[in-house]
Structures are given as C-alpha cells and as structure tokens.
Amino acid sequence: MNKVIIYSKPSCPACKRAKMLAETRKCEVDYLMMGEDFKPKELMEQFPGARTFPQIILNGEKIGGLAALTEMLTNEV
C-alpha cells in the first residue's frame, strides 16, 4: 500500500483532488493543512523553492504536486 502525505492549504481544489485520487487508489493518506498541522516556514524548510500546492510525499519521496501524483499512481502496475 502506498503512503501519501499531502501538504495542503485552505480553499485549494488541487489539494482536494490529490486527496481524492490517493483515497481512490487505496493509499494511506495523511492530509496536512497549513495553519493547523504545519506553518509556512516548516513547509519551506521541507520543500525549498516550492511555490504551489499541494506538495506531496509518496512513499517517503518528495514528488511535487497533483500532476506528479496522478502520473505516478496511474502508471502503477
């Protein structure tokens, strides 16, 4: 089973789509919300240079955003 950690922010449609995709693919999902679960400074330390949401970790690897998650989960055998 894949483990997905999604760093999200309020009112982020792509964040919600990433969560829905991961759940549909039966992944274990940790959905973290900025301001509740982490601070912006913590995000910048974890993902230097990140400018978009969501930021996603798949099985311990920083993969980027929704497009990367979609590609990786869709290409699984």
Task: Name each model feature, range by range.
Residues F47-I57, L66-A67:
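Structural micro-motif
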Residues K41-F47, L73-E76:
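Short amphipathic alpha-helix with an adjacent loop that forms part of the alpha/beta core around
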Residues E28-P40:
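Thiol-based oxidoreductase modules, predominantly thioredoxin-like and allied folds used
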Residues K9, M34, G60:
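Conserved residues at beta->alpha junctions
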Residues M1-C27:
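Local sequence-structure signature of Cys/Sec-based thiol-disulfide redox active-site neighborhoods
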Residues P13, F38, G64:
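Short alpha-helical
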Residues L58-V77:
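Non-catalytic, surface beta->alpha helical segment in thiol-disulfide oxidoreductase systems
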